[in-house]
Amino acid sequence: MAESEVTHIRYLIVLMLFIASTFSYGDRVVLSIAAGDLSRDLHLDPLRLGYLFSGFGWAYAAAQLPAGGLLDRFGSKRIYGISIVCWSVCALLAGVTGFMAAIPAFYALFLVRLVSGFVQSPVFPGNGRIVAAWFPTSERGRASAIFNSSQYFSLVLFAPIMGWIVHAFGWKECFWFAGAIGIALAAVWFKVVHGVEAHPWISRAEINLIQQGGGLASLDAGSRPRSNTLTWSAIAWLLTQRMFVGIYLGQYCITTLTWFFLTWFPIYLTQTRHVSIVKVGFLAALPALCGFAGGILGGVVSDRLLQAGHPLSVARKIPIVLGMLLAMTMVACNYANSSTTVMLLMSLAFFGKGFGALGWTVISDTSPRDLIGVNGGLFNLIGNLAGVTTPIVLGLIVKRTGSFDYALIFVAATALLAIVAYLPVVGEIKRIERPALPGVSS
C-alpha cells in the first residue's frame, strides 16, 4: 500500500468500539430481561430487585477514576482488552449462582454484579480516549455517536435473543451465552485494535489526516506512570471548572434515562402493560431501534452544524436540548390506554434520548490532552451514579405507589434538568488545558 494513500482504519477502530460497547451493554441487558423469572426464583420484591440492578452501578461508578488513570498510564488497548475478558468471566459466574438456594444466590449474584461493574469501568473512558486519538475534530461527533448508540443497539440485538433464551432454557443460560461471546470478542480486540502510530495497517497519509484535523494520534505512544499526587490534584482542578461541572451534571441526567430503559422498562411492559416475557424482548427492541437511529443522527447533525461554520457550542448543544425535550414525552404514557400508543411514545422518547446523548463527544472536544482518560473517568463516574440511584429510586417509587406513573415523571424531570445543565451552566464548549504545576515537567 502506498504511503500517500489514505486508509480508513479509523472506521474499523470505531466499529470495534461499537461492538465492544454493544457487548458491554448486552451484559447489563441480560439481568433486566431475565428479571421476571429470576425474581420468582429468588423471591425478590421490586425494591430488592432494584438493589440487584444497582449492584453493577455501585462498582462501575466507583471504579471510573482508577479506570481513567489506568488508561492514561498503560494505554487503551491493554486495559480495555483485559476488561472484556474479566466481564465475560463474571457473566459465566453469574449463571452459576442459579444453582444456589435463593438467599445465598441473591448475595452471590449481587457480588458478581459488583465485580462486573468494576471491571467494565474502562469501557466508556476508553472509548472517549480512543476517539480523541483516532478522529479529527470534524468527525468526532459521528464517531462518538456510533459507540454511544451501542446502548440502544444492545437492546435491539440482545433483548429478543435473551427473551427467547429465558423462555426456552432459563435465566442462567442467558449469562452463559453473554460470557461465551465476550471471550470471543476479546480475541478479536487484541488482534485489531492498536494505537494510531503503532497500527500495522494504517498509512502515513491517514496518520497525517488525523493529526492535522486535531486528532491526538500520539496519545498512547508515550504512556508513563504518573504520581498519585498529580492525578488527585488534576481531579480537584477539573471539579473547579464550571464547564466540566455542567457536563458532568448533564451526563448524570442523561444516564438516568439510560438506566430506566436498561432496567425497569421491560418490567414496566410486563407489569403495567401485561406483555409476556417473549414479547417483551421484541417490544423492548422497538424503542431501542429508535434510540439507535437517534444516536447516529444526533452525531451526524452535530458534525454537519460544525462543518457549516456554526460554533462548537451551538453544534453540540442544539441536538442535546432537542433530544431531551423529546425524551420528556414519556410522561404522556401515564395517560395512554393502548399499548401501541405507549410504544410510540417510548420510541419517541428513546429517539430523543439517543439524539441528545453527545456527552462523550463534548468530553473528547474539551478535555485537557494529558487528562483525557482521567476526565473521561470522572465524567463517567458522576454520570453513572445514576446507575446506583435510578434502579433503587424507581424501585422504591413503584413499591410505595404501586404503579409506574410517578416513576415516569421522575425520569422525565431528569431530562429537563439535563437541559438546564447544558444551557446556563456549561457555557461555551471549548478545549481547556490545565495550568502547569510547579515542579512538574511536561
What are these regions (language model features)?
Residues 31-35, 237-296, 356, 360, ...:
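Extracytoplasmic gate region of multi-pass secondary transporters
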Residues 54-69, 285-298:
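Central cavity-lining transmembrane alpha-helices of secondary-active solute carriers
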Residues 85-102, 324-337:
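C-terminal ends and interior cores of transmembrane alpha-helices
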Residues 90, 104-122, 340-356:
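Hydrophobic core of transmembrane alpha-helices in multi-pass small-molecule transporters
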Residues 112-152:
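Cytoplasmic helix-loop-helix junction between adjacent transmembrane helices
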Residues 147-200:
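Helix-loop-helix hairpin linking two adjacent transmembrane segments in secondary transporters
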Residues 295, 364-401:
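A late C-terminal transmembrane helix in Major Facilitator Superfamily
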Residues 313-359:
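C-terminal transmembrane helical hairpin of 12-TM major facilitator-type secondary transporters
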